[in-house]
Structure formats: structure tokens, C-alpha cells
Amino acid sequence: DAPSSKQWFPIEGITHEQAKNSVMAIRDLLVSSKTKNEFLYKLELNFDVYRSVGYDNDGTVLFTGYYSPDFYASTTPSKRYNAPLYTRPSDLATDPASGQPLGRILSDGSISTWPTRREIRLSNLFNGNELVWVEDDLDAYTIHVNGSARLRLDNGELMYIGYAGKTDRPYTGLGSSIIEAGLLSQNKLSLRNIRRLYDHDPDQINTLIDRNESFVFFQEYDGSKWPAGSLGVKVTAQRTI
């Protein structure tokens, strides 16, 4: 029922309510079906099945895995935990329907563009808004890109954090920047190899991280509902797409 979902409807005569009811009906069918054949039979009997237009309007669809990483962290800074993740600032403006960032609300009520990631980092703009600290800038950046994480705190507790908004600056992938810099080839690009590059020369990788001007904010999540997909429902390992 989120506005970001309703904005896409109606489409091809299908209302948001119909789409919502269909998802719930398929969920019930999955629970009640005793065999694969029973599920497929009732699916064909009771549903109209559409092929996605894809991102190119020609049926091309990309399915990706949902990454739910663990990181070590602390609610207080230290020599080990020195890379902060920040809560959403009160002057962040977003579109109420889509959730997309609009900019920064100024004192006169106007909206301007946020500073870049590098400018934010150098100015310590969000000092006092820290939610938690992780071990280094690459861990923090990885969580920025992923949008959520499970944190193993130094006191032994678990903390779950997730996306709470971002600035209106453009996104540039670290992987593409590393390839352009000649540090890795396309077939060698992986988080493990990026970690090796960072451990060898963190300043070099931080410079490439700064090319991504977008900056993400976080909030603490209910661990029983983490990680949640786009529908706000907890995803299932090896099943959810």
C-alpha cells in the first residue's frame, strides 16, 4: 500500500488493488498446494500470467541475489571502529509518492542540491548524527550500496540497520571506477578483490569511492523482519526473487 508502489498503477487496466490481491492469492496458493503440479494447475486455472516488458520493453529482465552481509560494529567510535554510518537528517527532502530524494531543505524553505560524498566526508557535515561505527570506509561504503546490514556489536549484541534515505547526488559504481582506473579487469572484479586493493592502498580506493557522489542514511530495523524486500516482507534465502 506504499505510495511508491501505487504510483505505477493502473497499468494495462490492472489496478493496484487487483495486483495486491493477486500477490496475496499466490501466497495462499503456495501454502495450500501439496505438490508442484497442483500449484501449476491452479495457477493456470485462476490467474492470467503476463510476461514482463523488461527494462528494454523487449522482455529482458535481470534477476539479482539479495545480499545480507554481517559486519562488526560499535555504537561508540574507537581506533578499530572509525567509519560512521549516519541517521537521516531532518533537512532531507524526498518525494512522498516515490521516495526519491529531492535535495536539501534550506532555512528559507527552498530546496538545494546536497554536497558530494567527498564534501560531506571532509566537512564532517553530519557529526552528531552517527548511528553506528564500522571498521573502515570500505565496510561503510559496502553497506551504503547494499542498503542494509546485520551488525555484530562489540558487546556481543546484534543490530539490524536499513535504508532511511539518500542525497540527490548521482550514483557511480565503485566497480566501474576500479576498472576505469586499470586496477582490475571485468572478469576479476569481485568484492574480495576490491577488499584486497583497499587493504593494500586504502587512500587510492577511497578516492574512487568519492566518485560516487550519492550518500545514504540509515535507521535501526526490527531484526525479526530483516532483510525485507521491496514489498516490506522478509525475504527467504534461496527463494525470493
What does each of the following model-derived ranges do?
Residues A2-G229:
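Secretory/export targeting leaders with adjacent low-complexity proregions
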Residues L231-T240:
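Hydrophobic alpha-helical bundle architecture
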